From Swiss-Prot:
Component of the 30S ribosomal translation pre-initiation complex which assembles on the 30S ribosome in the order IF-2 and IF-3, IF-1 and N-formylmethionyl-tRNA(fMet); mRNA recruitment can occur at any time during PIC assembly. One of the essential components for the initiation of protein synthesis. Stabilizes the binding of IF-2 and IF-3 on the 30S subunit to which N-formylmethionyl-tRNA(fMet) subsequently binds. Helps modulate mRNA selection, yielding the 30S pre-initiation complex (PIC). Upon addition of the 50S ribosomal subunit IF-1, IF-2 and IF-3 are released leaving the mature 70S translation initiation complex. Gene3D superfamilies: Nucleic acid-binding proteins. PROSITE patterns: S1_IF1_TYPE (PS50832). This is Translation initiation factor IF-1, plastid. It is found in: Plastid. It comes from Aneura mirabilis. Pfam families: eIF-1a. Keywords: Initiation factor, Plastid, Protein biosynthesis, RNA-binding, rRNA-binding. Residues 1-72 form the S1-like domain.
Length: 78
């Protein structure tokens, strides 16, 4: 599948599941079952419940996706 065919969305991790799977609540209210991308796995980036993430999903199955980026938390000084 080509990169431009994927749908990018943002949401919050609500649940951590076995085998690096996560349940993410998107900004539009939908629940998505996601796994982490290879780059996140290779760089040992920790994803915990409550983190904001960017998810890409196929237009054919919007209930599954892949976490491609963990967004930075806003600092308390901002």
């Amino acid at each position: 599948m080509k990169k431009q065919d994927l749908i990018d969305m943002e949401g919050v991790v609500t649940e951590s599941l076995p085998n690096a799977m996560f349940r993410v609540c998107l900004d539009n209210g939908c629940q998505v079952l996601t796994h982490i991308s290879g780059r996140i796995r290779r760089n040992y980036i920790r994803i915990l419940p409550g983190d904001r993430v960017r998810v890409e999903s196929s237009p054919y199955d919007l209930t599954k996706g892949r976490i491609t980026y963990r967004l930075r938390a806003k600092s308390s000084t901002d």
